[in-house]
Curated annotation (Swiss-Prot):
GO molecular function: aspartic-type endopeptidase activity
Recorded coiled-coil stretches: none
Active site positions: 126, 144
Species annotation: Burkholderia ambifaria (strain MC40-6)
Membrane topology: Multi-pass membrane protein
Localization of this protein: Cell inner membrane
Xref: PANTHER family: LIPOPROTEIN SIGNAL PEPTIDASE
One cellular-component annotation, GO: plasma membrane
GO biological process, one term: proteolysis
Protein name: Lipoprotein signal peptidase
Domain of life: Bacteria
């Protein structure tokens, strides 16, 4: 009996893209809610260390390059689109590696959430604001959180893989 060629299971993109889509959906819905509810810069304390505040980030993480002349909008958009292509390629090749793929799906969803902001608004909408005493962490959003969790899981997965190969 002749064997038929079939695509390897590693090519299953749909579940991982579904996770990315969920991240994008929650990120964009939260930003729309903040835009409709808050005035720019108004701070609403929820606890002694956490507030909601509407701020615009024209730069990258922690406001990096936010005061540049405007070129950064397109540079970070291109970077996000490039990351999307690389991540989709990696998901297609390594879709069977669950933790690795989950981390990439979270990073992808977060990156695209911020790319959407840059294309639609010209900046990223941030609103989660942590502060303790005189220390203040830069405001961020759900997309940034997904990117961070994805990056931590990616490092954890790699450390686990390296330890397992010893």
């Amino acid at each position: 009996m002749a064997k038929t060629l079939s695509k390897p299971a590693s090519g299953a993109l749909a579940p991982w893209l579904g996770i990315s889509l969920i991240v994008i959906l929650f990120d964009q819905l939260s930003k729309i809610a903040i835009l409709k509810t808050f005035a720019y810069g108004a701070q609403h304390a929820l606890t002694s260390f956490f507030s909601l505040v509407l701020v615009y980030n024209r730069g990258a993480a922690f406001g990096f390059l936010s005061t540049a002349s405007g070129w950064q909008r397109w540079a970070f958009t291109a970077l996000g689109i490039g990351a999307t292509l690389v991540i989709c390629f990696l998901l297609r090749r390594h879709g069977q590696q669950r933790l690795f793929s989950l981390s990439l799906a979270l990073i992808l969803g977060g990156a695209l959430g911020n790319v959407i902001d840059r294309l639609v608004y010209g900046h990223v909408i941030d609103f989660l604001d942590f502060h303790v005493g005189g220390w203040h962490f830069p405001a961020f959003n759900l997309a940034d959180s997904a990117i961070t969790v994805g990056a931590v899981l990616l490092v954890y997965d790699e450390l686990r893989r390296v330890r397992g190969s010893r």
